[in-house]
Amino acid sequence: MDLWQLLLTLALAGSSDAFSGSEPTAAILSRASWSLQSVNPGLKTNSSKEPKFTKCRSPERETFSCHWTDAVHHGSKSLGPIQLFYTRRNIQEWTQEWKECPDYVSAGENSCYFNSSFTSVWIPYCIKLTSNGDTVDGKCFSVDEIVQPDPPIALNWTLLNVSLTGIHADIQVRWEAPPNADIQKGWMVLEYELQYKEVNETKWKMMDPILSTSVPVYSLKVDKEYEVRVRSKRRNSGNYGEFSEVLYVTLPQMNQFTCEEDFYFPWLLIIIFGIFGLTVMLFVFLFSKQQRIKMLILPPVPVPKIKGIDPDLLKEGKLEEVNTILAIHDSYKPEFHSDDSWVEFIELDIDEPDEKNEGSDTDRLLSSDHQKSHSNLGVKDGDSGRTSCYEPDILETDFNANNIHEGTSEVAQPQRLKGEADLLCLDQKNQNKSPYHDACPAAQQSSVIQAEKNKPQPLPTDGAESTHQAAHIQLSNPSSLANIDFYAQVSDITPAGSVVLSPGQKNKAGMSQCDMHLEMVSLCQEDFIMDNAYFCEADAKKCIPVAPHIKVESHIEPSFNQEDIYITTESLTTTAGRPGTTEHIPGSEMPVPDYTSIHIVQSPQGLILNATALPLPGKEFLSSCGYVSTDQLNKIMP
């Protein structure tokens, strides 16, 4: 493809020689040459050994010059003299002919100089090189495109200041514009670029272009030699021209202590030594305070200590001695009055009270009370046997209708205890058939009648009458006392909160036992008044020492009903003293267990109560009135 283009160019050149006087032919040749170059810029009309244009420049935008290379001869063929032809590409004047270079000498060898008379700034130029009539190279350009100013002249520098350390200094570099550039009239506006470097360096440091002819250069090292040069170009167009002559700048030594190299503060060395010093101080501190730090990080395990007990006993595991010490000291004794929360209430089957109590002594004792309080039946007992002497603040409203009923209950409690003693005496009289016991019912009857006379009469309200009133009325009749059994079982609870007893095991005893019960009841009445169906162990002890112990000849095994039964204090006391006939020294005290804790719920109406622990021989008995466990009950029972 390149060969055919070359042949076409040669053909056009030959036709131009044949028609040298024809201007249109020359224009066609020039147009063809430039079209070939535009299609393939690397394409040259001549070989690489032929002359070609190197540059065209206008230093002041008024004149310009073009330069080319020398021709190289190859073989026997030699080129003729090189000629430059130019033409102005005026669109309106296509008839203008090609003209030869006006001056081959002023711009130097292998150059053509165009003075101001041949220079037109706004009209493009086309030039070509020919040898023996053949075009070897050509190009088109505008004068504004080839403006390259001459180098600035008269470079110098002045010292501005020196740093406090005497290591760096600032200078001011000045120069003058090219003498042929019309700067004063504004025909050209130039930009300047300054470059500097140390003498031994190869890379130049460039500064930003400026419009002025002076620029400061900062932070130059003292005792160093620098090279400075400047070049210029037309503002916003064109290329930079040649550099000016190199200006050498040498800064003298301002301080005799100034070193050749830069003085750098040894920050890294200071940081390393600082870290090392802090590490050493930290290790010294840890070594001196290691015991205290160890206690802070790993505190010692506290030694087991109990006030009044040797810690060695706990370490050696001597639990028996520890328990003995705990039993001696009052402050370590356990409390037995905690609530039994597993029993919430007792449900009573009182839908048909007449059928349940029909034909029994309880029916005869409480016949009048059931008629008056039948409308109040169906009440649930929420006490569950948990009330003790440690709970004196329980409201009386659960057992009485109003404050008047409270007075009635307080008076009725001693009468009830006395009535139970009378019942026991009557029962023994009927069994023994002894005339000696005939005086007991009379005394009992007189005491009951006297108690009823002294008892205040309450107002007639619902639930105000106690079941013991009916019991005392029945006791006043001598004919009915013979058939009354010993009441030791709870069969019902009235709406007012009183306990209804049922006949239990008969106790055979002599007349002295009857007198003992009467005297014990009278003494208990003098000391305190019982408010509840159960009483505290401390209160029971007040009654026990007065009663003398007698010799019991025979005992009958009490049979406990598995339904509707409460095991009371009297029944368990009788059972505990059953094995063998024993004689007691007069005046000795026999502790009576206090049954205030529910042990087993056998049926909706049957409960078995736990007794508090009796004092063992040689040990102090606990004075609290709390609930006791089954193990303590087993220790008391033989």
Curated annotation (Swiss-Prot):
Tell me the segments the record calls region Disordered. Answer: 353-388
TM region(s), chain numbering? 265-288
Q: Where in the cell is it found?
A: Cell membrane
Keywords attached to this Swiss-Prot or TrEMBL record, sorted alphabetically, are: Cell membrane, Disulfide bond, Endocytosis, Glycoprotein, Membrane, Phosphoprotein, Receptor, Secreted, Signal, Transmembrane, Transmembrane helix, Ubl conjugation
**Record has Signal as a keyword:** yes
**All residue ranges annotated as the Fibronectin type-III domain in the record:** 151-254
* Chain positions of motif UbE motif: 340-349
State the annotated membrane topology for this chain. Answer: Single-pass type I membrane protein
Which intervals of this chain are the motif WSXWS motif?
240-244
**Subunit text:** On growth hormone (GH) binding, forms homodimers and binds JAK2 via a box 1-containing domain.
Q: Which PANTHER family match?
A: CYTOKINE RECEPTOR, INTERLEUKIN 5 RECEPTOR SUBUNIT ALPHA
What exactly does this protein do? Receptor for pituitary gland growth hormone (GH1) involved in regulating postnatal body growth. On ligand binding, couples to the JAK2/STAT5 pathway.
Domain remark in the UniProt entry: The WSXWS motif appears to be necessary for proper protein folding and thereby efficient intracellular transport and cell-surface receptor binding.
Designated name of the protein: Growth hormone receptor
Taxon lineage: Eukaryota, Metazoa, Chordata, Craniata, Vertebrata
